[in-house]
Amino acid sequence: MIIAIQLLVLLLITLSTILVVGVPVVLASPGQWEQSKGLIYTGAGLWTGLVIVTSLVNSLVV
């Protein structure tokens, strides 16, 4: 179970890093927001889901 938590945290850190770099680049590029809006919202939804799933799995370990 601890390995599952570690993998979830690794995914969360990876996705967070991608979003921290990607979102400002998309917002700074002219015309890119309209093209990438769905991708940014999908990434934010995945990030939120990962936070919730990680917290639920972590609560089962205690």
UniProtKB/Swiss-Prot annotation:
Keywords: Chloroplast, Membrane, Photosynthesis, Photosystem II, Plastid, Reaction center, Thylakoid, Transmembrane, Transmembrane helix. One of its GO terms (cellular component) is chloroplast thylakoid membrane. It is a multi-pass membrane protein. Gene3D superfamilies: Photosystem II PsbZ, reaction centre (1.10.287.740). GO terms for biological process: photosynthesis; photosystem II stabilization. It holds the Pfam family Ycf9. Its main location: plastid. InterPro entries: PSII_PsbZ, PSII_PsbZ_sf. It is found in: Plastid, Chloroplast thylakoid membrane. The keyword Transmembrane applies. The chain crosses the membrane at residues 8-28, 41-61. It comes from the Eukaryota. PSII is composed of 1 copy each of membrane proteins PsbA, PsbB, PsbC, PsbD, PsbE, PsbF, PsbH, PsbI, PsbJ, PsbK, PsbL, PsbM, PsbT, PsbX, PsbY, PsbZ, Psb30/Ycf12, at least 3 peripheral proteins of the oxygen-evolving complex and a large number of cofactors. It forms dimeric complexes. Belongs to the PsbZ family. May control the interaction of photosystem II (PSII) cores with the light-harvesting antenna, regulates electron flow through the 2 photosystem reaction centers. PSII is a light-driven water plastoquinone oxidoreductase, using light energy to abstract electrons from H(2)O, generating a proton gradient subsequently used for ATP formation. PANTHER family: PHOTOSYSTEM II REACTION CENTER PROTEIN Z. This is Photosystem II reaction center protein Z. It comes from Porphyra purpurea (Red seaweed). The lineage of its organism: Eukaryota, Rhodophyta, Bangiophyceae, Bangiales, Bangiaceae. The gene is psbZ.
